[in-house]
């Protein structure tokens, strides 16, 4: 799937002002991918601790809302993708199918079953923290939307979102150290999406804890070792995902100075590894294809960083160029025909295009 060209300069200007670079054709493509994925039960990689033989069950029985898309977190964020496209581009051809899918999957009964599963003693660390973050992101997306259907889905999802928010409140005080890997367990990513949820859904206690933990873990970081990136299975840049968190946490007047200490080489485009898209040698390999996701997540991080800097800050222009280069590279891998990437990369593409 290529980035494609926008229909006119005027349209591009409007989209850039609103933060939405997603074209109608791209919206249709990723919507079709997500619609197919959320209904595809197999293959499936369960994160399922069994206390006995009675816990043996297929994905649809365990997770009636989020049984598809290969794994639970990918299914959750595919629903976020569908909700976001419907909110931003209500006239997308697949709109009726999207509404029907969200109505069916996000029923009160389905969500109640997900809550019951989440509260099992054996599920204490189920999908911590990547799946938790995406569930809160879905809740935040629905919660900010005035659409009548979306308001109903938001109410239905609220018990699960509240359970996840409660799990954050239980976990974070015990978490002495951050997790800085460029994969699912990254705590900067977990805090970023929890912060978004707390702000849009009035979860004051969670928001305060997230801010406190982000400052404890990341405020003093200097001269990030980004020259060591990427690792071979990264789909996040540990460096940029941290900066994407801190631009949320810090006052707008604080962030530019923090960024100068954290990444002092931006104006020199150093380290080069952070400005050069990753090479993806084999899109049929489930770990190597993570690097397509890395390019897309770097794109949304660089774009968000640029937006958090003053307009006359030279680093904003450099960050925007880096975002454009990574987005172009990452979009090549979306809809490749390889399910190891197709079950999740569309979501990263939508974030890169609409952040």
Describe every region a protein language model picked out.
Residues 3-6, 11-67:
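Low-complexity, Ser/Thr/Pro/Gly-enriched N-terminal "stalk/linker" regions
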Residues 16-22, 79-92, 133-149, 190-202, ...:
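Well-ordered alpha-helical scaffold segments within catalytic/enzyme domains
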Residues 19-24, 60-76, 116-132, 174-187, ...:
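Solvent-exposed loop and edge beta-strand segments that line ligand/cofactor-binding
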Residues 28-52, 94-104, 150-163, 198-215, ...:
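An acidic intrinsically disordered interaction segment
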Residues 32-35, 39, 43, 64-68, ...:
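HEAT/HEAT-like alpha-solenoid repeats
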Residues 50-57, 110-111, 165-169, 218, ...:
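Active-site-adjacent bridging/hinge elements
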Residues 76, 85-198:
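Extended ligand-binding groove/face enriched in aromatic
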Residues 201-338:
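Long, repeat-rich segments with strong aromatic
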């Amino acid at each position: 799937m290529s980035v494609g060209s926008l229909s006119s300069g005027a349209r591009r200007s409007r989209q850039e002002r609103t933060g939405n670079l997603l074209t109608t054709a791209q919206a249709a493509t990723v919507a079709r991918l997500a619609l197919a994925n959320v209904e595809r039960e197999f293959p499936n990689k369960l994160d399922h601790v069994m206390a006995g033989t009675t816990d043996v069950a297929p994905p649809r029985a365990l997770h009636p809302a989020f049984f598809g898309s290969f794994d639970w977190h990918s299914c959750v964020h595919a629903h976020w993708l569908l909700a976001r496209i419907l909110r931003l581009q209500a006239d997308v051809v697949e709109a009726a199918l999207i509404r029907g899918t969200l109505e069916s999957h996000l029923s009160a009964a389905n969500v109640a079953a997900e809550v019951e599963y989440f509260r099992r003693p054996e599920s204490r660390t189920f999908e911590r923290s990547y799946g938790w973050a995406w569930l809160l992101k879905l809740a935040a997306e629905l919660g900010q939307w005035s659409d009548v259907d979306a308001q109903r889905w938001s109410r239905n999802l609220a018990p699960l979102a509240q359970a996840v928010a409660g799990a954050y409140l239980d976990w974070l005080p015990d978490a002495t150290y951050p997790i800085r890997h460029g994969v699912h367990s990254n705590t900067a990513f977990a805090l970023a999406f929890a912060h978004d949820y707390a702000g849009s859904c009035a979860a004051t206690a969670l928001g305060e804890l997230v801010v406190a933990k982000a400052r404890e873990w990341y405020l003093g970081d200097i001269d990030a070792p980004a020259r060591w990136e990427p690792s071979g299975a990264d789909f996040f840049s540990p460096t940029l995902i941290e900066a994407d968190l801190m631009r949320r946490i810090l006052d707008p007047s604080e962030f530019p100075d923090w960024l100068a200490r954290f990444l002092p080489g931006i104006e020199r485009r150093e380290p080069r590894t952070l400005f050069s898209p990753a090479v993806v040698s084999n899109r049929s390999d489930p770990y190597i294809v993570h690097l397509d996701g890395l390019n897309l997540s770097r794109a949304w991080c660089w774009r968000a960083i640029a937006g958090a800097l003053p307009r006359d800050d030279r680093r904003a222009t450099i960050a925007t160029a880096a975002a454009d280069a990574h987005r172009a590279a990452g979009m090549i891998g979306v809809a490749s025909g390889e399910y190891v990437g197709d079950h999740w990369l569309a979501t990263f593409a939508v974030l890169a295009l609409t952040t």
